[in-house]
Amino acid sequence: MKKLCAFGELLIDVTPYGVSDKGYPLSEFNPGGAPANVAVALVNLGVEASFIGQVGDDHWGHFLKNVLDDKRVDTQGLLFNKKYLTTLAMVNLAENGERSFSFYRQNGADVMIEMNDLFKLKIDESDI
């Protein structure tokens, strides 16, 4: 069986979720990031997948690791960064249902990642 190694962003999608009784917008916090989503989808199809990336050593970073672990994605290549926060993506929904994103990621942990030997090993172990 082929092994996939996904590299890139793992973040929180802050998605609109209605309006409160006081008329304020409500939001739902969902795991996101295209590479991580691909890894989860392939595991669901029976493919062995690992994820390489970096999140903040914060509430959201640990939440995201737990999600990937629960979905059976190998997270040995996921780093926690004490200096930079986990990236947030604000999801904007148009009336026609199209999504657009505003990223809160200046110096976000996912874009401050540097290649290391562990990443190289995980990539070498993978077929894709």
Label the model's feature ranges.
Residues I52-I128:
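Conserved N-terminal subdomain of the carbohydrate kinase-like
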